[in-house]
Amino acid sequence: MKKILVVILMTIVSISCTNSNESETQSTPNPIGVEIPNDSTRISLYGGDMNTIKLWETYIKAHNEKDLKTIESINDDAFKGYPPNGDVIDGSKAHIGFLEEWFTNSSPMWRTKYMIANEFTDNKGVLNQWVTSGQDLTDTVDNEEVTVHHVHDVLFVNGKIKMIYVYERAKANE
C-alpha cells in the first residue's frame, strides 16, 4: 500500500512539474502590414516599440509648450520634414527656425487622437521604426481659430526623429 501511495504521489508531482505547450508564447511575430519600397518588393511590417510612442508624446507636448530645446534634443541632426504645403524642412536647425517663427506669430496646439508604432528591417538590414499618429491641430489664422486634422508618419532612428511626413485635412462641417 505504501508503494502505491508513493507511486501515485510521484506521478502527481511529475505531472504538475511538466510544462504544457499552452503556456508557450509565440516566438515569431505576426505581420501587421507591408512596406513597399521603390523597387516594389514587399517587406513585412510588425508592431513596433512602444518607446517610440512615448518619445512622440514628449515631442508633441514640447510643441504645445513651445519648448524648442526639447524638440531639438529629439530631432536627428539630419532631420527632414515634409509639411502638407509641399515645402521641405532640411535639418534640425531649419526645423527649429521654422517653429520659432510659427510660435512667435501663433499658438498652435495639437491634440492626439491615435498613435500606431510599427517597424521593419529593410533590405540593407537597417531597422526602421515608425509612428503613425493622428492629431487635431488648432491654430489662429487671420484672427480666427481654425482646426485641421493631421496625420504624421514619423521615422525614428537611434532614438531620434529623422523624418516626418505631415498630411492635412480640413475639419468636416458636421
Give the location of each predicted region.
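C-terminal motif of bacterial Sec signal peptides marking the signal peptidase cleavage site
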Residues: V13-S16
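Hydrophobic pocket/interface hotspot
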Residues: Y59, T70-E72, F79, G91, ...
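Short, low-complexity N-terminal intrinsically disordered segments enriched in polar/charged residues
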Residues: T18-L68, S73
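A short gly/proline-enriched turn/hairpin at secondary-structure junctions
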Residues: T41-Y46, K80-D90, N105
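Short beta-strand edge/turn micro-motifs at domain boundaries
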Residues: S23, T147-E174
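Short, cysteine-centered beta-strand-loop-beta hairpins and adjacent loop/turn segments enriched
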Residues: V88, T138-T147
